[in-house]
Amino acid sequence: MCPPEGDAGTGMVATNTVTKRTGNVSAGTSVFAMIVLERDLSKVYEELDMVTTPAGDLVAMAHSNNCTTDLNSWISLFHECLTSFGVKVDANELFSTLYNKALEGDADCGGLLAYCYHSGEHITGFTEGRPLFVRKSDSKFNLANFIRVHLSTALGAMKTGLDILTKEENVTIEQILGHGGLFKTKGVGQTIMANAIGAPVTVMETAGEGGAWGIALLADYMNNKGNLSLDEYLSTKVFKNSVAETIAPTKEGIEGFETFMTRYRNGLAIEQSAIDNLK
């Protein structure tokens, strides 16, 4: 028997992200990133939660309440439109087609802006939310940029929290493992995520396994660890031959996402106005 761990610790084990300078991102209805730190942070940040790996290493968590819900609503609208014309399309095919379309868009989403706030976001200071899509008259308004901006904004609040780590605390992130619905369409969520974080994002075939499997691995570790540390055990005994695909960020992609994030931060007043005036 091993003592039960919380979702954070078992999730780290299930995704083999217990080593310093690594982390994992779970992205679906909500999204959170957990980064294993090399040292304590210089101060407390209300935007970040602090947990530990099962081995006791410090982990910073950036958690966002909202991720794919708003994008799912838009894709449902496209499905309704097609159905109105008598076109039958498989839901999985529609998601895959539209997600892949996003990769044809501009790195900065063509000047478009969206917020996926169905509920509040503590990282950006909102106790409630209003889903929004905003553009200027000269923005590059096309399908590719429309889908891309909704994928990008799904990571906006989380990115705001991670920027505290990377830009204010100089935390190095060498690799991220992604899991959750955002990564279901091969390569798309990974690409957006890699450019958002500025680090390679890996998705393993076991990424769908969650905390229950992590608990089982911890129990097996307690029985069979020998002289191995937890990260050595996971790397050599569990994940040594795992199948994974990694996508690295690009200079253009990183710069484009940073341009989008400037627009995202500057537009938060629009979100606040919507909350104040749309009751």
Regions found by a protein language model. Give the residues of each.
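Active-site core segments that coordinate phosphate-bearing ligands/cofactors
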Residues: 1-177, 182-279
